[in-house]
Amino acid sequence: MRQTFEHFLNTATVMKSPKPLSISIFDYLKRFDSGWWCCCYSLNTVRKDNLPLPLFIHRDDIEYEIRNRETGIVFLNGFNVWHKGFEVNFLGTNAYYDVRNNLIFAALHEPDMSRIQMWKWISKFIITAVLKMRYEEAYFSWRGMIDFMKGPEWLMGTDAERLNNQLRKHLPDTEPMELEEQPTLKELQRCYNPDRNKKQFWKKITFNGWFLPADKEVGILRPYDAPFSIFRKKRIELRDTGAKKKRVAVREERQLFKAAMYCINTWRILMVQYGKTQKEYKTKYEILKNGKLWIEKILTNRG
């Protein structure tokens, strides 16, 4: 029997302001937000002067929800999204968007975040990429910071698809995997265990064995493996299980030096330029979320 619209509204999970909410499933959250999936916004919220930021991918949905969470969203009970696990793919070009878009988000919504905090998590991106011998991701992380500092005018004038294609040119060649691999339950539990990298003091101070004689046996690293699983390895096979691709990577000492330069450069630029760039994003915020900008970008891309 077809249900009435009134019945549908009564059975949907409505999330308004965080303060009066007493649904236990959300109790552990410090603040309430959601991605695009399985939720609806009022048409009074989705206006021409209140559209998502032109970020291409990553963080645009979270920024939109944080911006509008006081107006309330509706979660549709019974609706599900099947999505490939994020843990089965290496970051690739997403490392660029993770850094750039998180910096934009921080500039707009996290005024209390210090530049030292920003430097720490960007440096962690860079160092982790080198530990995994995925040197292109170290570059993408640094490049994301550089492009953020170019400001909102640069973002508004950028052809996002062309930029993404330029970034992809930095990706090394891969080849298909002969056999399909899926993570086991134990591997997934270890991947999401916050303590998985504890008790690794020796591996950390030796930079995962880079300062020690190399182990010549070929190692294997998958997206859900900890970088410490390839301790002292000189040569590894990177298996991107989600993309069903693989390639060989080799420990290169010059990449360690390059990562150090990225971190030093990031520190200098954050300390000198972040305040100015943050003000620019706040000043241009109304333009960034206005429908006129989207129309201009669409017409420009068509031309």
What are these regions (language model features)?
Residues 33-38, 48-66, 71-81:
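Donor nucleotide-sugar recognition loop
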Residues 18, 34, 74-76, 114-117:
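Short hydrophobic/aromatic-rich motifs at helix boundaries and adjacent loops
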Residues 76-92:
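Active-site donor/metal-binding and catalytic loop motifs
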Residues 64-73, 89, 97-102, 144-147:
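C-terminal, active-site-flanking charged/polar segments
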Residues 52-56, 89-94:
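Short, contiguous acidic/charged loop-to-helix segments that flank catalytic cores in large enzymes
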Residues 101-303:
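Terminal low-complexity segments of carbohydrate-biosynthetic enzymes
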Residues 22-23, 42, 79, 115-118, ...:
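Residue-level signal for well-ordered alpha-helical segments
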Residues 1-47, 54, 98-107, 125-138, ...:
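Extended catalytic-interface subdomain
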